[in-house]
């Protein structure tokens, strides 16, 4: 005699059905790769004057999001959604996640009035950055699915070490973006990523402003 499912088991069963249905909607069958464009917002020229900052190469220390991602593709992979052998692996176009992060950081600093340089000739701020997350995902949610409000989510997280004149400060800059979609498409992934980049830019600029204020306060002591 078959035992009746508990409410918890019924909930987990429904989640698996919902997740599989969504993935079949996305891919039909199997795993495919979606290549997305991540834009650097509000591009401006490097200021001729202003405090100098050197952004070193960004270290990619992100986890392996899915074992299905080949080792050669991991530097470009932005996770995606994979369940029960079906899904989408999202990959960044033309460059690596670490290099794109560095480009975003450089532009954010230029927009603050910093002059970015490849090396420090006089007094400057040197930034060492480690990329801990740059990913997209699509959580399975029954209520969102039945109401056609499924979300694509994007997250960026970078640990930064700022050094200037013997002083060291660490902070984490983060960004989050969400996009409610009806049709799973490259464009909808890109909307979530665009919002995460803007959020990350704001977080980095705020942390750098606090860095400047702290450095100025210590200089006056």
Can you name each region flagged by the protein language model?
Residues 63-66, 139, 168-170, 183:
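Short acidic, gly/pro-rich beta-turn/loop elements at beta-sheet edges
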Residues 29-100, 206-221:
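A structural "domain/chain start" motif
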Residues 99-111:
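Amphipathic alpha-helical segments
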Residues 79-96, 161-214:
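Short secondary-structure boundary motifs at beta->alpha junctions and helix caps
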Residues 1-29:
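Sec-dependent bacterial lipoprotein signal peptides
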Residues 10-16, 129, 160, 219-221:
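Intrinsic disorder/low-complexity segments enriched in polar/small residues
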Residues 62-65, 147-151, 196-200:
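Short alpha-helical linear motifs
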Residues 30-40, 112-168, 179:
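Surface-exposed short loop/turn segments
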């Amino acid at each position: 005699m078959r035992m009746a499912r508990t409410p918890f088991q019924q909930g987990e069963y429904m989640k698996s059905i919902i997740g599989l249905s969504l993935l079949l909607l996305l891919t039909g069958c199997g795993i495919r790769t979606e290549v997305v464009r991540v834009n650097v917002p509000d591009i401006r020229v490097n200021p001729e004057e202003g405090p100098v900052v050197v952004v070193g190469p960004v270290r990619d220390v992100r986890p392996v999001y899915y074992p299905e991602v080949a080792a050669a593709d991991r530097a470009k992979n932005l996770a995606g959604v994979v369940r029960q052998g079906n899904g989408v692996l999202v990959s960044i176009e033309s460059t690596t996640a670490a290099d794109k992060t560095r480009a975003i950081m450089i532009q954010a600093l230029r927009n603050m009035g910093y002059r970015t340089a490849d090396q420090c000739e006089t007094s400057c701020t040197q930034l060492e950055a480690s990329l801990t997350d740059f990913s997209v995902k699509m959580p399975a949610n029954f209520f969102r699915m039945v109401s056609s409000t499924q979300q694509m989510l994007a997250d960026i997280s970078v640990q930064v070490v700022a050094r200037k004149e013997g002083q060291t400060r660490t902070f984490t800059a983060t960004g989050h973006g969400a996009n409610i979609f009806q049709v799973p498409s490259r464009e909808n992934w890109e909307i979530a990523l665009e919002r995460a980049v803007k959020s990350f830019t704001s977080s980095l600029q705020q942390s750098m402003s606090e860095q400047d204020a702290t450095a100025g306060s210590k200089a006056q002591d």
